Amino acid sequence: MKAFIVRVLLIFIGAILLIQLWIFSSLVWWRTHEVDTTMFMRIDYWSDPSEPIIHEWLDYDDISDNFKHAILAGEDAKFIHHHGFDWDGIRFALERNNEEGEVVAGGSTVSQQLAKNLFLYNKRSFIRKGQETVATWMMERMWSKRRILEVYMNSVEFGKNLYGVEAAAQYYYGKSAKSLTREQAAFLAALLPDPKYYQDHRNDRKLQYRKRVILRYMNSTQIPE
């Protein structure tokens, strides 16, 4: 029995180490190569293979600065200054969730969201959060802030099977992400908390309020050069 338990533990530890190696090697490759698929994209495709994933990569300099400012105003205003984790944001989210008695705020940074999108899944669990933390730690030490934001903008979800700002700009406005206006950029950034719902409810009050807040603060956010 004891030998069996030891064997199971060794298999478990080996599996964990293999996952870390997979994440590490993926991050090494993606430092210099386009990210053409993520775990979120795969999950969407597996749920309905008849529906194609809409995704087009765009280099950092070819994405409107309006969108870079908008996405950070909406998701992670301290992106330039932290090392993957915004402890003030996490504390604020915990306080709000305690007040409301349910999860109404997440506190995740752009780096944490990207780690989840690339390697994990959306269901909340301590195991997922722990792996997200490890992947975020690795990413922040292997990639520049510019690269993290570039991959995030090209990987984040904007609707059903719709990934990346270029695909979103073409879908919602029929134009490239390079020429997004402030209003358009703020709208796309405002979609992110619940993109599949807002895709069909574009006049939702919460969405419009979030867009106004992003417009108010987007010029004060600092973006990577």
UniProtKB/Swiss-Prot annotation:
Gene Ontology terms: cellular component: peptidoglycan-based cell wall; plasma membrane
Domain of life: Bacteria
Catalytic activity from the UniProt record: [GlcNAc-(1->4)-Mur2Ac(oyl-L-Ala-gamma-D-Glu-L-Lys-D-Ala-D-Ala)](n)-di-trans,octa-cis-undecaprenyl diphosphate + beta-D-GlcNAc-(1->4)-Mur2Ac(oyl-L-Ala-gamma-D-Glu-L-Lys-D-Ala-D-Ala)-di-trans,octa-cis-undecaprenyl diphosphate = [GlcNAc-(1->4)-Mur2Ac(oyl-L-Ala-gamma-D-Glu-L-Lys-D-Ala-D-Ala)](n+1)-di-trans,octa-cis-undecaprenyl diphosphate + di-trans,octa-cis-undecaprenyl diphosphate + H(+)
Subcellular locations according to the entry: Cell inner membrane
Entry annotated with the keyword DNA repair: no
Membrane topology: Single-pass membrane protein
HAMAP family: PGT_MtgA
Function of the protein: Peptidoglycan polymerase that catalyzes glycan chain elongation from lipid-linked precursors.
The protein's name: Biosynthetic peptidoglycan transglycosylase
This protein's encoding gene: mtgA
